[in-house]
From Swiss-Prot:
It comes from Bacillus thuringiensis. Belongs to the delta endotoxin family. InterPro entries: Cry1Ac-like_dom-VII, Cry_V, Galactose-bd-like_sf, Pest_crys, Pest_crys_Cry1Aa_dom-IV, Pest_crys_dom-III, Pest_crys_dom_I, Pest_crys_N_sf. CDD domains: delta_endotoxin_C. Toxic segment of the protein is located in the N-terminus. The keyword NADP does not apply. GO terms for biological process: sporulation resulting in formation of a cellular spore; symbiont-mediated killing of host cell. Keywords: Sporulation, Toxin, Virulence. SUPFAM superfamilies: delta-Endotoxin (insectocide), middle domain (SSF51096), delta-Endotoxin (insectocide), N-terminal domain (SSF56849), Galactose-binding domain-like (SSF49785). The gene is cry1Ga. This is Pesticidal crystal protein Cry1Ga. Promotes colloidosmotic lysis by binding to the midgut epithelial cells of insects.
Length: 1166
């Protein structure tokens, strides 16, 4: 009631306050959200290990009970709390995802129930597998939408529900997977996803809860409502996510939530209480339970009210006489005698208040608003009421903000009152408010620390009754379910009173959930006697945030028993330097009979090691066991706990080393671990210089290679090796295989009689399916191979033996090739080639193997014999054809030189003749492998013999031409330029000088030998009217010139010059190695008619190969890309006898455009 200035009472609920009305409406509308969330938390706390009943329960509580309207309430609740309204489209999108998940999960539950009724039925197994995958895909697709940017807080409660559903689903698959028919590799992948998602979802929820709370600012109704409502709908559920780890928690687990939430202050809605959080909210503390409250009463304007109080509590496990008396809240007024109230009941569980009803009176007097509490009733679960001042007409009720399930408080309550604070406004403002603030803890946080014999008992360390010096209590990060303890120096954390209900012969092991910036030792004492001491590793670096991944659950391997049913358990830490940080969340007591994760890891490693060998005596490896798989098994062994199974770990390590040695022995590749590339000319790996060898990482245990892309497909990135013929067996199939971390446009070849070829694209860590969730680094920078990794499904097809190209969806690859007869003299061998010829291409690969797969029988044997015969037939044909081509090429090369020593060119040998001879040399087939032109082919020796002589010819030719850069391949280097001229590259890949203006001139000073004779030879073309001139002269007189015209009339030249046609005619005796005025290259050098026109490479085989073709880049070696001049170019020359040691060459024109291809000044032979 409100008292006016005339002391007339006005009903409290008639106060005109919009914010109060909003929050009253909010509480009535959104009670369903808290009720549903509390029900889910209780279900998760009470549920056992997975069974069909768990999925059914989850469906009944959440996914089968909520529709679009209910899901909208989850969204609208947070919208009002943070004052951020989302659009109808965004709300509809979120609810559509949730209802879709509900439908998919319903079908999964039906399939699970059907399978449970008939678990051995293959159809039932297939259906539940299919429904699991569809639901899993739906969640994986939908969750990112619920975490969309700028809506993370608004969607937080529904994100939590979907995340919980996903973890439940993944746990089902790990737990039931073997009986569903999933492979062990599938199950391991699902378990890795499960643990990775627990971390991801926990961090997401804690982060956005804390950010949303911080954005609200100072204490207010909104702040307390957000803290309370989202603790119930988000953080309580998140705190139980770790229990989904079925291997860490394989039996029922008893968890406790020790966090505190606050109901709104019991004041009138129009009162503004802008106080700091520190004055209202409790600092982190050891958990306590109310024993009694002493309430003091004051009076204002003749109205008695709650003016102050004292709280007397006990910590966990403490009895009478061990009380904590908190400082006085408010004032110890004496308008009425103090009232002491305490909960009543027969047991500690009954002696707890789950509800508080209050009567608030408000009135205005002398211009000041008053809001006071004049009566409160506290209810236990048996409806026993403890009343402060008898009253009637209670008008506020905490059950509106913390509802119970159903109508029976004994089974439906979720929270108990744990403390009472006090709100007092300043007496110097116009508003006068005095009211209690109630804080509550979850019912799962029991009044005792009882350790059960048949479950894993988790006890948060804040349930200690004594805090040791140097230990502090800090606010939890959000996913721990409460506050945590911290030390920065050695010593004990605290003492816990524990109760044992089982026979004292029951053995337990202790685990600790901790985070630490240092390696350290934990120890435990029971009643002052040391029970365990063990080494524990650091989990984080100094300054790191307390994220989920910083915490680790680890324990002692030695089991123990309690000697007393009521014992004191102490935990401490030592063995580290000061100023480090050590945090403990909880202690776990595990019945010794339960299989620890370490035991599971040992069993898994033993199975993996034994599965490597063909028999129990480890004589031989299984054929399908890859070198990469052996490395992974080695990692499993290395990650075993030294504390738990040191001897077994050593034994398994020796077996894995033996397996690795067997793998090396059967691998026919030299240097499979990439100790070097190009180290030995005829052995090991050969490759392009841009390939890098990198040490092992979290993917590869040993060295691996990285192949980058290339800007020119004719100069690819490559890596190759030849398998010697001596290592091969007749009529046997061999397999190349390995592991690719990622690749794009990686081509893999195996070549013998033909080429087997695959193009492999493997998405890597940046793909939709990541290889690893993280790349953790050890304390010394080494890769942490014990951290969970997400790998591709190894059951997917990893070879494409019948196709030319294959886009892999597996990191494993294999390619096989068949060997027929072997010939050590011929030494055909097998070429192994990796190549990338695109700019975007790349690859990282390792663990390469080339090994014997099986002998060839039946059809495979007949096929390889047929292929071998075809290859030999074509090889013989190639030899005949090569003899003809070689003879002609050699004659062309020999004609360039004076003698067989090849040390002097013929006097009339010109550049065109050398190019023409080079082209004939390049007509020799199979000089290099068409797949990779750096690998010599069957005709490499004769090709390189002639090509060396061509190189000599070019060198001799360059040496006798005294004009520098006469072919303009280096632009205008060495030339003096006046006016505007250009050097252009024409479509025949030649550089030409273009003189477009009559005033332009290009010249070069050349040193010569006086008294010797020279030939000036110019190849040029004139466009338009006028003449182009190339002049040679000395300082005084002795001038000659060559003129070029576009006129068709016959020109008259000096006696010492010849025309192009005359010159060409004179060269016919050298079998026409030049270009005439109107004569093309093909006419002068057509194809030899003795060579078949339909000649194809000898490895071409349509039925058995993948279409091996001649390498189009092979012609680019040396001068093979030389093409004839276009029609219209003319070559002219003159003889010149200098009288001094310097001459000048000048190029110009009178009109039009003058195009010069080359200028030569050649010393005549003596």
């Amino acid at each position: 009631m409100e008292i006016s200035d005339q002391n007339q009472y006005i009903p409290y609920n008639c106060l005109n306050n919009p914010e109060s009305e909003i929050f009253n409406a909010r509480n009535s509308n959104f009670g369903l959200v808290s009720q549903v969330s509390s029900g889910l938390t209780r279900f998760l706390l009470e549920a056992a290990v997975p069974e069909a009943g768990f999925a059914l329960g989850l469906f009944d509580i959440i996914w089968g009970a909520l529709g679009v309207d209910q899901w909208s309430l989850f969204l609208r609740q947070i919208e009002q709390l943070i004052r951020q309204e989302i659009t109808e489209l965004e709300r509809n999108r979120a609810t559509a995802i949730l209802t879709g998940l509900s439908s998919s999960y319903n079908l999964y539950v039906e399939a699970l129930r059907e399978w449970e009724n008939d678990p051995n039925n293959p159809a039932s197994q297939e259906r539940v597998r299919t429904r699991f995958r569809l639901t899993d895909d739906a969640i994986v697709t939908g969750l990112p939408t619920l975490a969309i940017r700028n809506l993370e807080v608004v969607n937080l409660s529904v994100y939590t529900q979907a995340a919980n559903l996903h973890l439940s689903l993944l746990r089902d698959a790990v737990y039931f997977g073997e009986r569903w028919g999933l492979t062990q590799a599938n199950i391991e992948d699902l378990y890795t996803r499960l643990t990775s998602n627990i971390q991801e979802y926990s961090d997401h929820c804690a982060r956005w809860y804390n950010q949303g709370l911080n954005e609200i600012g100072g204490i207010s109704r909104r702040y307390l409502d957000f803290q309370r409502d989202l603790t119930i709908s988000v953080l309580d559920i998140v705190a139980l996510f770790p229990n989904y780890d079925i291997r860490t928690y394989p039996i029922p687990t008893q968890s406790q939530l020790t966090r505190e939430i606050y109901t709104s202050p019991v004041v009138a809605g129009n009162i503004n209480f802008g106080l700091s959080i520190a004055n209202v909210l409790r600092a982190p503390h050891l958990m306590d339970f109310i024993d009694r409250i002493v309430i003091y009463t004051n009076s204002v304007r003749s109205t008695p009210y709650w003016a102050g109080h004292e709280v007397i509590s006990r910590r966990t496990g403490q009895g009478q006489g061990n009380e904590i008396r908190f400082p006085l809240y408010g004032v110890a007024a004496n308008a009425e005698p103090p009232v002491t109230i305490r909960p009543t009941g027969f047991t500690d569980e009954q002696r707890q208040w789950y509800r508080a009803r209050s009567r608030v009176v408000s009135f205005r007097s002398s211009g000041q608003d008053f809001s006071l509490v004049d009566a409160v009733g506290f209810l236990t679960i048996f409806s026993a009421v403890s009343i402060y001042r008898n009253g009637f007409g209670f008008n506020t009720d905490t059950i509106d903000e913390i509802p119970i399930e159903g109508t029976d408080p004994f089974t439906g309550y979720s929270h108990r009152l744990c403390h009472v604070g006090f709100l007092a406004s300043s007496p110097f403002i116009s508003q006068y408010a005095r009211a209690p603030i109630f804080s509550w803890t979850h019912r799962s946080a029991t009044l005792t620390n009882t350790i059960a014999p048949d479950v894993i008992t988790q006890i948060p360390l804040v349930k200690a009754f004594n805090l040791h010096s140097g230990a502090t209590i800090v606010k939890g990060p959000g996913f721990t379910g409460g506050d945590i303890l911290r030390r920065t120096n050695v010593g004990s954390f605290g003492d816990m009173r524990v109760n044992i209900t089982a026979p004292l012969s029951q053995r337990y092991r202790v685990r600790i959930r901790y985070a630490s910036t240092t390696d350290l030792q934990f120890y435990t004492n029971i009643n002052g006697t040391t029970i365990n001491i063990g080494n524990f590793s650091s989990t984080m670096d100094s300054g790191d945030d307390l994220q989920y991944g910083r915490f680790r659950v680890a324990g002692f391997t030695t089991p123990f028993t309690f000697s007393d049913a009521n014992s004191t358990f102490t935990i401490g830490a030592f063995g580290f330097s000061p100023n480090n940080e050590v945090y403990i969340d909880r202690i776990e007591f595990v019945p010794a009979e339960v299989t620890f994760e370490a035991e599971y890891d040992l069993e898994k490693a033993q199975k993996a090691v034994n599965a490597l060998f063909t028999s129990s005596n480890q004589i031989g490896l299984k054929t399908d066991v890859t070198d990469y798989h052996i490395d992974k098994v080695s990692n499993l062994v290395e990650c075993l706990s030294d504390e738990f199974c040191l001897d077994e770990k050593r034994e398994l390590s020796e077996k894995v080393k033996h397996a690795k040695r067997l793998s090396d022995e059967r691998n026919l590749l030299q240097d499979p671990n990439f100790r070097g590339i190009n180290r030995q000319p005829d052995r090991g790996w050969r490759g392009s210089t841009d390939i890098t060898i990198q040490g092992g990482d979290d993917v590869f245990k040993e060295n691996y290679v990285t192949l980058p892309g290339t800007f020119d497909g004719c100069y690819p990135t490559y890596l190759y090796q030849k398998i010697d013929e001596s290592k091969l067996k007749v009529y046997t199939r061999y397999q190349l295989r390995g592991y690719i971390e990622d690749s794009q446009d990686l081509e893999i070849y195996l070549i013998r009689y033909n080429a087997k070829h695959e193009t492999v694209n493997v998405p890597g860590t940046g793909s939709l399916w990541p290889l690893s969730a993280q790349s953790p680094i050890g304390k010394c920078g080494e890769p942490n191979r014990c951290a969970p990794h997400l790998e591709w499904n190894p059951d997917l097809d990893c070879s494409c033996r019948n196709g030319e190209k294959c886009a892999h969806h597996s990191h494993h690859f294999s390619l096989d090739i068949d060997v027929g007869c072997t010939d050590l003299n011929e030494d055909l061998g097998v070429w192994v080639i990796f190549k990338i010829k695109t700019q975007d291409g790349h690859a990282r690969l390792g663990n390469l193997e080339f090994l014997e797969e099986k002998p060839l029988l039946g059809e495979a044997l007949a096929r390889v014999k047929r292929a071998e015969k075809k290859w030999r037939d074509k090889r013989e044909k190639l030899e005949l054809e090569t003899n003809i081509v070689y003879k002609e090429a050699k004659e062309s090369v020999d004609a360039l030189f004076v003698n067989s020593q090849y040390d002097q060119l013929q006097a009339d040998t010109n550049i065109a003749m050398i190019h023409a001879a080079d082209k004939r040399v390049h007509s020799i087939r199979e000089a290099y492998l068409p797949e990779l032109s750096v690998i010599p082919g069957v005709n490499a020796a004769i090709f390189e013999e002639l090509e060396g002589r061509i190189f000599t010819a070019f060198s001799l030719y360059d040496a006798r031409n005294v004009i520098k850069n006469g072919d303009f391949n280096n632009g205008l280097s060495c030339w003096n330029v006046k006016g505007h001229v250009d050097v252009e590259e024409q479509n025949n890949h030649r550089s030409v000088l273009v003189v477009p203006e009559w005033e332009a001139e290009v010249s070069q000073e050349v040193r010569v030998c006086p008294g010797r004779g020279y030939i000036l030879r110019v190849t040029a073309y004139k466009e338009g009217y006028g003449e182009g001139c190339v002049t040679i002269h000395e300082i005084e007189n002795n001038t000659d010139e060559l003129k070029f015209s576009n006129c068709v009339e016959e020109e008259v030249y000096p006696n010492n010059t010849v025309t192009c046609n005359d010159y060409t005619a004179n060269q016919e005796e050298y079998k026409g190695a030049y270009t005439s005025h109107n004569r093309g290259y093909d006419e002068a050098y057509g194809n030899n008619p003795s060579v078949p026109a339909d000649y194809t490479p000898v490895y071409e085989e349509k039925a058995y190969t993948d279409g091996r073709r001649e390498n189009p880049c092979e012609s680019n070696r040396g001068y093979g890309d030389y093409t004839p001049l276009p029609a219209g170019y003319v070559t002219k020359e003159l003889e010149y006898f200098p009288e001094t040691d310097k001459v000048w060459i000048e190029i110009g024109e009178t009109e039009g455009t003058f195009i010069v291809e080359s200028v030569e000044l050649l010393l005549m032979e003596e």
